A protein has these predicted regions:
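A beta-strand edge to alpha-helix "cap/lid" segment located at domain peripheries
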Residues: 66-142
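A solvent-exposed, acidic/Ser-Thr-rich amphipathic alpha-helical stretch
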Residues: 30-83
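Short, low-complexity N-terminal intrinsically disordered segments enriched in polar/charged residues
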Residues: 1-30, 140-142
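Alpha-helix initiation/capping motif
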Residues: 1-2, 47, 51, 102
Length: 142
């Protein structure tokens, strides 16, 4: 596997798209600097919003995402990958459908990654958390 930042980012996106959670997690260093742009307390409708630092936790994150969405209706797209040394920023749009209610949502995203020695040491994603929480909130009974 290449240690080039752009190559590692491309491989991450490929493995994520394939739904290969363990192989996706294998691209991450331990510990990983993990940040999702959500309030610290998270949201009860969005169970994957929690701290992560190990490969097992990273794999669990992607499994949880898949469990709550319809993979066949995923229309997430990447519009740009910007690389500066060990840093990369991936820009795009998340297009997902919630499995439980069939609610579709879209959100722009920016993903800041750092790659060192061929492993991802930073995973910071910024997305429209309000839109996502609203789409998943239909699963919660009042």
């Amino acid at each position: 596997m290449s240690t080039d930042t752009h190559d590692v980012v491309e491989e991450l996106l490929r493995r994520m798209a394939e739904g290969d959670h363990d192989r996706t997690a294998a691209l991450f260093a331990e510990p990983v600097d993990w940040l999702l742009s959500w309030p610290a307390e998270g949201h009860p409708a969005v169970p994957w919003i929690q701290p992560r630092s190990s490969r097992a936790e990273v794999a669990d994150h992607f499994r949880s995402l898949e469990a709550h969405h319809v993979p066949e209706l995923n229309g997430t797209s990447v519009t740009r990958i910007l690389v500066d040394g060990t840093h990369a920023v991936v820009l795009g749009e998340i297009v997902q459908t919630v499995r439980a209610e069939g609610t579709a949502y879209t959100s722009p995203f920016a993903l800041h990654l750092t790659v060192e020695d061929g492993l991802i040491t930073r995973y910071h994603i910024f997305e429209d958390s309000l839109t996502i929480a609203r789409a998943l909130s239909t699963q919660i009974s009042p």
